[in-house]
Amino acid sequence: MTKAVIVSAARTPVGSFLGSFANLPAHELGAIVLKAVVERAGIDPSEVSETILGQVLTAAQGQNPARQAHIKVGLPRESAAWVINQVCGSGLRTVALAAQQVLLGDARIVVAGGQESMSLAPHAAYIAPGQKMGDMKMLDTMIKDGLWDAFNDYHMGTTAENVAGKWEISRAEQDQFAVASQNKAEAAQKAGKFADEIVPVTIKSRKGETVVDADEYIRHGATLEAMENVRPAFSKEGTVTAGNASGLNDGAAAVLVMTEDEAARRGLTPLARIASYATAGVDPQIMGTGPIPASRKALEKAGWSVGDLDLVEANEAFAAQAIAVNRDMGWDPSIVNVNGGAIAIGHPIGASGCRILNTLLFEMQRRDAKKGLATLCIGGGMGVALCLERP
């Protein structure tokens, strides 16, 4: 039976909150990577059957931002484009959906990925019913729609505190993990390891043009001493800080998916085959542990064991949850996030799933790795995972 394959991949640099991409809507970031994956695959844009993009923060962003990106870059008006919102897992779930589309014969070529501008998430107020007098509360849609647990009425950071308590993960462990992530990302950036996956973004302003070609959130020279001085963010006695958590970020990433037979017919060499994918649910209070059941399901579907994996990209929403995932999965930590993770690189929520997939794909190619896994935790208590294989 033919498999779904990824024939090209690309991502933008990850921008800091209110940083270089502060005024760039998500669909414009998305358009950049859509164009890049089509060009890198060497196919005619008119042959793209469908575009599927993850995006969490869509309030006031206009109708169907995936369609906006699709049309902006000149992909066919005759083919469809749509957004999914599975919170932090969106950008990876779209790739699983793309695989399903091509394997079922519902599409021949699908572009999948994610786009997000956390900087442009608006504040909003419910004024339609009218308010005769008194103050009016403005709602931060970034927090409400992206970072707030709807079931327990608290921030995602509190779920990380829950995991830290239940898994007995100390502040020291979290800080050490976070510094290691920063140091690995710094080393990777200096060595040019992200260059192949990144598409430079040109920012136009009254002062001229600026080209952004590197992730801007990575903190060079991060030390444990500095990390230890950051105050807890969600509880006075807590262990989760801004330093050992991922950031608020902007960015986009995409891959181009078709069947193995289609790639062979076109003479294209895939970056990897999609061996399996899975989602799973957990208690929303410990949402950060979602990758544990999701990864186990994906491995079982692929017929693999943890020991078969050569590389893992496990999103670092928080150091606490990342440590818990590593512990319970029992995989070799030396193969996990070898170039740093979201604590260092950043977490543009709807795009992160495809960002980690990009990083995994290019590192597998660099190391000639045969089996890899990408996984993320998801707000609301879920996880998503996808297994890749190379010949």
Swiss-Prot record:
Gene Ontology CC entries for this record: cytoplasm
Protein name: Acetyl-CoA acetyltransferase
Enzyme class: transferase
Database matches in SUPFAM superfamilies: Thiolase-like
Catalytic activity: 2 acetyl-CoA = acetoacetyl-CoA + CoA
Disulphide connectivity of cysteines: none
UniProt pathway annotation: Metabolic intermediate biosynthesis; (R)-mevalonate biosynthesis; (R)-mevalonate from acetyl-CoA: step 1/3
InterPro entries given in the database record: Thiolase, Thiolase-like, Thiolase_acyl_enz_int_AS, Thiolase_AS, Thiolase_C, Thiolase_CS, Thiolase_N
Subunit structure: Homotetramer.
Catalytic-site annotation from UniProt: 88, 347, 377
Family, as annotated: Belongs to the thiolase-like superfamily. Thiolase family.
NCBIfam families: AcCoA-C-Actrans
Pfam families, A to Z: Thiolase_C, Thiolase_N
Record-listed E.C. numbers: 2.3.1.9
Subcellular location field: Cytoplasm
Organism for this UniProt entry: Paracoccus denitrificans
Lineage: superkingdom: Bacteria
Record's keyword terms, sorted: Acyltransferase, Cytoplasm, PHB biosynthesis, Transferase
Coiled coil stretches, renumbered: none
One annotated GO molecular function: acetyl-CoA C-acetyltransferase activity
PROSITE patterns found in the cross-reference section: THIOLASE_1 (PS00098), THIOLASE_2 (PS00737), THIOLASE_3 (PS00099)
Any one GO BP annotation for this protein: poly-hydroxybutyrate biosynthetic process
